[in-house]
A protein has these predicted regions:
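Glycine-rich phosphate/dinucleotide-binding loop and adjoining beta-alpha-beta core of small-molecule
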Residues: 174
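Hydrophobic alpha-helical transmembrane segments
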Residues: 1-169, 177-308
Length: 308
């Protein structure tokens, strides 16, 4: 998918030659093309599964489950974070800083060249919190929408098609959704689509995550404080997801980051809690797994009730 986006980006930039309107239209066409190809690919695979299920339903179900699980990024995110945590735990952490920064650069968008140990840990906490929605809960939500659509007609886009549509929008946003140079116009439509598709999942996470822990205050108050801290973030979704994880994992987030050399100060979240450490990052990862389990059970229960 990344290769297709890069190819289409280069093509659009050559045709537009810096013209803002043409770049914007090119971004719309890139978004439509990549999302359509991803959705139709998922839909075709779903049709094949329906066709072959007649002969071997068990094998088809197992294969279909494997393909669906490929839409979730929880395992790869956990692996990357634990690799960095293990390096941070090393006695001679200062010696490992360059290696830490290099590994961190693969999973964060901020500049990492000058980050110290505490800033690396904060980056891990914030990335785990934000990416849990993009990588786990939003795909699960859109899988559920696909399953729901099948209740009306199994020729409609199902869980795989809907999950791949979301992953396409998320990938476009991660590659083109920047506000500098040509990308300010070329990546606009992809970024907005990703915001729209993540809007509901982020708010469901806000409401359901406190069920996975024992917050120091009433659940309603925890949700309210997370909302108040998160809503001031320029992003309509990442601030909310970071805030609820910050309160549930009892860790402070936010502060100064640099993106391509430009300083960006994000508001402090859960400022009464301590800064990120290894234990708080592990708590965040544990919360993600717990909430993922609750969501899957909830989806299965809703499907069962629909089919009654």
């Amino acid at each position: 998918m990344g290769a297709i986006i890069n190819f289409l980006r280069g093509l659009a930039e050559r045709i537009a030659k810096g013209n803002k309107s043409k770049l914007y239209i090119g971004g719309v066409l890139i978004t439509f093309t990549v999302v359509f190809l991803s959705g139709i690919s998922g839909w075709i695979i779903e049709r094949l599964f329906f066709f072959f299920e007649i002969n071997n339903p068990i094998a088809t179900s197992l294969l279909f489950s494997f393909v669906l699980s490929s839409s979730l990024a929880s395992r790869s995110l956990n692996k990357s974070i634990f690799e960095i945590i293990n390096l941070v735990s090393h006695e001679n952490v200062e010696y490992n800083l360059n290696n830490l920064r290099q590994k961190l650069s693969f999973i964060v968008g901020r500049d990492v060249d000058n980050l110290n140990k505490n800033e690396i840990l904060r980056a891990l906490a914030e990335t785990a919190s934000e990416n849990s929605v993009d990588g786990v809960f939003a795909p699960l939500f859109w899988m559920f929408i696909g399953i729901f659509l099948w209740q009306f007609n199994n020729l409609m886009p199902g869980p795989l098609a809907m999950a791949w549509i979301f992953k396409a929008s998320s990938t476009i946003d991660s590659m083109l959704g920047y506000k500098d140079g040509n990308l300010k116009w070329l990546g606009f439509s992809g970024a907005k689509l990703d915001d729209i598709m993540t809007w509901i999942p982020a708010r469901i996470v806000l409401i359901t995550l406190p069920l996975c822990c024992r917050p120091k205050q009433p659940i309603i108050k925890t949700i309210q404080q997370a909302w108040e801290d998160g809503i001031v973030d320029p992003s309509p979704n990442s601030g909310i997801s970071e805030a609820i994880f910050a309160y549930c994992a009892e860790v402070r987030m936010g502060g100064v980051n640099f993106y391509k050399g430009k300083k960006k100060t994000k508001p402090l979240i859960a400022k009464s809690y301590p800064i990120a450490n290894i234990n708080s990052i592990k708590r965040i990862l544990n919360l993600i797994l717990r909430l993922q389990f609750i969501w899957v059970l909830g989806i299965l229960l809703i499907i069962k009730l629909i089919n009654l």
